Amino acid sequence: MLLMIDNYDSFTYNIVQYFGELNQDVKVVRNDQVTLEDIERWQPKYLVVGPGPCSPTEAGISIPAIHHFAGRIPLLGVCLGHQAIGQAFGGNIIRAKTVMHGRLSDMYHTDKGIFSNLPSPFSATRYHSLVIEQESLPECLEVTCWTNQNDGSIEEIMGVKHKTLPVEGVQFHPESILSQHGHQIFKNFLEIYA
């Protein structure tokens, strides 16, 4: 079973549908209606921390779940869930240079983890005003996806991967209809961490 932490976001069930199309039995729980003990009892095979309209600090059980289950259950964070991963491991969450609501950006990546065998760049939809700060990125996390500035340097972090644990995050929305390769990103997560 794949457990999805719903951070009260309208995209939650798009993610659920994508994972359902990948033959996953998905259980959805709201971030303020579940305990760590509940999750332990359910014994999910995967844990997905979903998007939401707030900051990671306001995302209920999201950060405690990351702290508790990182290294025990493969974990994927999407948008707010990605930010929660950054914060849970010691990074700062800051305002993005530009608020991105329903805007497409080119995603450049390392071809590692969930981005394996995808073209670089590819186009993905962004809905966020916060990002993981590059300068405070924890040593245990590596940048796997980013947007470029005009000079080719990293503009903003769009994906992270823990260096030793089965934990990855994406800032953009793979499940958005305009995002390319969304199914493949989720499929890669399931296959890599099976």
Curated annotation (Swiss-Prot):
<feature type="active site" description="For GATase activity">
    <location>
        <position position="175"/>
    </location>
</feature>
<comment type="function">
    <text>Part of a heterotetrameric complex that catalyzes the two-step biosynthesis of anthranilate, an intermediate in the biosynthesis of L-tryptophan. In the first step, the glutamine-binding beta subunit (TrpG) of anthranilate synthase (AS) provides the glutamine amidotransferase activity which generates ammonia as a substrate that, along with chorismate, is used in the second step, catalyzed by the large alpha subunit of AS (TrpE) to produce anthranilate. In the absence of TrpG, TrpE can synthesize anthranilate directly from chorismate and high concentrations of ammonia.</text>
</comment>
<keyword id="KW-0315">Glutamine amidotransferase</keyword>
<dbReference type="InterPro" id="IPR006221">
    <property type="entry name" value="TrpG/PapA_dom"/>
</dbReference>
<keyword id="KW-0028">Amino-acid biosynthesis</keyword>
<dbReference type="InterPro" id="IPR017926">
    <property type="entry name" value="GATASE"/>
</dbReference>
<keyword id="KW-0822">Tryptophan biosynthesis</keyword>
<dbReference type="Pfam" id="PF00117">
    <property type="entry name" value="GATase"/>
</dbReference>
<feature type="active site" description="For GATase activity">
    <location>
        <position position="173"/>
    </location>
</feature>
<feature type="binding site">
    <location>
        <position position="83"/>
    </location>
    <ligand>
        <name>L-glutamine</name>
    </ligand>
</feature>
<feature type="binding site">
    <location>
        <begin position="129"/>
        <end position="130"/>
    </location>
    <ligand>
        <name>L-glutamine</name>
    </ligand>
</feature>
<feature type="active site" description="Nucleophile; for GATase activity">
    <location>
        <position position="79"/>
    </location>
</feature>
<feature type="binding site">
    <location>
        <begin position="52"/>
        <end position="54"/>
    </location>
    <ligand>
        <name>L-glutamine</name>
    </ligand>
</feature>
<keyword id="KW-0057">Aromatic amino acid biosynthesis</keyword>
<comment type="subunit">
    <text>Heterotetramer consisting of two non-identical subunits: a beta subunit (TrpG) and a large alpha subunit (TrpE).</text>
</comment>
<protein>
    <recommendedName>
        <fullName>Anthranilate synthase component 2</fullName>
        <ecNumber>4.1.3.27</ecNumber>
    </recommendedName>
</protein>
<keyword id="KW-0456">Lyase</keyword>
<dbReference type="GO" id="GO:0004049">
    <property type="term" value="F:anthranilate synthase activity"/>
</dbReference>
<dbReference type="InterPro" id="IPR029062">
    <property type="entry name" value="Class_I_gatase-like"/>
</dbReference>
<dbReference type="GO" id="GO:0000162">
    <property type="term" value="P:L-tryptophan biosynthetic process"/>
</dbReference>
<comment type="pathway">
    <text>Amino-acid biosynthesis; L-tryptophan biosynthesis; L-tryptophan from chorismate: step 1/5.</text>
</comment>
<dbReference type="GO" id="GO:0005829">
    <property type="term" value="C:cytosol"/>
</dbReference>
<feature type="domain" description="Glutamine amidotransferase type-1">
    <location>
        <begin position="1"/>
        <end position="194"/>
    </location>
</feature>
<dbReference type="InterPro" id="IPR050472">
    <property type="entry name" value="Anth_synth/Amidotransfase"/>
</dbReference>
